[in-house]
Curated annotation (Swiss-Prot):
Family: Belongs to the universal ribosomal protein uS12 family.
Pfam family, one: Ribosom_S12_S23
The organism of origin for this protein: Magnetococcus marinus (strain ATCC BAA-1437 / JCM 17883 / MC-1)
PANTHER family: 30S RIBOSOMAL PROTEIN S12 FAMILY MEMBER
HAMAP family, per database record: Ribosomal_uS12_B (MF_00403_B)
SUPFAM superfamilies according to UniProt: Nucleic acid-binding proteins
Described purpose of this protein according to its UniProt entry: With S4 and S5 plays an important role in translational accuracy. Interacts with and stabilizes bases of the 16S rRNA that are involved in tRNA selection in the A site and with the mRNA backbone. Located at the interface of the 30S and 50S subunits, it traverses the body of the 30S subunit contacting proteins on the other side and probably holding the rRNA structure together. The combined cluster of proteins S8, S12 and S17 appears to hold together the shoulder and platform of the 30S subunit.
Name under which the protein is recorded: Small ribosomal subunit protein uS12
Subunit (UniProt): Part of the 30S ribosomal subunit. Contacts proteins S8 and S17. May interact with IF1 in the 30S initiation complex.
InterPro entries named in the record: NA-bd_OB-fold (IPR012340), Ribosomal_uS12 (IPR006032), Ribosomal_uS12_bac (IPR005679)
GO cellular component, one term: small ribosomal subunit
Top-level taxon: Bacteria
Residue list for modification 3-methylthioaspartic acid: 89
Length: 123
């Protein structure tokens, strides 16, 4: 507990909040190159094969990023854009790949929620 004199001299320092997405370095998105594209299984009550890519970012960080939507065209050396946002049942996956930008195609035949999956408006 500080004294009144210490508070007058130094004041209170605001506590810094730890970021959930350190590799983005306060940017909304980051570009990177896929080093490995693979599937992995989720945590205990769930069961699936989740699509994940290991991405080397332009700032040198290497992160795991989730590939949302049904089907994708990513392979090694694909250039992708990642955003923050974790996948709750995949430990260590804190980023999402943005569909429909750079080398990532949008989800085919997507009718609803298209903007999140980079799908064009159906004719």
């Amino acid at each position: 507990m500080p004294t009144v004199n210490q508070l007058v001299r130094l004041g209170r320092k605001p506590q810094k909040k730890k970021t959930n997405v350190p590799a983005l370095q306060a940017c909304p998105q980051r570009r990177g190159v896929c080093t490995r594209v693979y599937t992995t299984t989720p945590k205990k009550p769930n069961s699936a094969l989740r699509k994940v890519a290991r991405v080397r970012l332009t700032n040198g960080h290497e992160v795991s990023a989730y590939i949302p939507g049904e089907g994708h065209n990513l392979q090694e050396h694909s250039v992708v854009l990642i955003r923050g946002g974790r996948v709750k049942d995949l430990p260590g996956v804190r980023y999402h790949i943005l569909r429909g930008s750079l080398d990532t195609q949008g989800v085919k035949d997507r009718k609803q929620g298209r903007s999140k999956y980079g799908a064009k408006r159906p004719k």
